[in-house]
Amino acid sequence: MTREDATAEILAARLARGLSWQQLAEAIDRPLVWTISALLGQHPVPVESAEILVELLGLDQSAVPVLAAVPMRGGLPTAVPTDPTIYRFYEVLQVYGGAIKELIHEEFGDGIMSAINFSVDVERKPHPDGDRVVVTFDGKFLPYAWTAADGRR
């Protein structure tokens, strides 16, 4: 079984069993967005959690080691995403990425926001003109530092 096979089986089983992502996240006591991302193939799932998920979803036990394996992260099928929801994030970063980068540098200095020491949250916010989607990225600041192999800076 490949990771892609496991993901396809997870998606089909979740719908067939009427399970929400929230129910799956609660079953393994993990954050909702992390759980979804993991089940879509972007994080390794601890074996104990994978066993719970496989049982809930009615998958073959051969899915456990596949879910627990360290995945190839960040791969999208095309260079520019074509799914409208995912493309909006691409578009947001095209329009606001430079401004966000400048603000990070002004506030923190020369560095980046980690996507490894990181969490993301998605919330719904009522608004008179239509509900809003609030996405919060919470990443550790990592300063750029030149360090030579011999420890000199």
From Swiss-Prot:
Substrates-to-products reaction catalysed: cyanate + hydrogencarbonate + 3 H(+) = NH4(+) + 2 CO2
Transmembrane segments: none
Function: Catalyzes the reaction of cyanate with bicarbonate to produce ammonia and carbon dioxide.
Keyword vocabulary terms for this entry: Lyase
Biological process terms in GO annotation: cyanate metabolic process
Protein name, as recorded: Cyanate hydratase
NCBIfam families: cynS, PRK02866.1
Keyword Lyase: yes
Enzyme Commission numbers on file: 4.2.1.104
Active site: 88, 91, 114
InterPro entries assigned to the protein according to its UniProt record, in alphabetical order: Cyanase, Cyanate_lyase_C, Cyanate_lyase_C_sf, CYNS_N, Lambda_DNA-bd_dom_sf
SUPFAM superfamilies: Cyanase C-terminal domain, lambda repressor-like DNA-binding domains
A GO molecular-function descriptor: cyanate hydratase activity
Entry's family note: Belongs to the cyanase family.
Bridged cysteine pairs (disulfide): none
Pfam families: Cyanate_lyase, CYNS_N
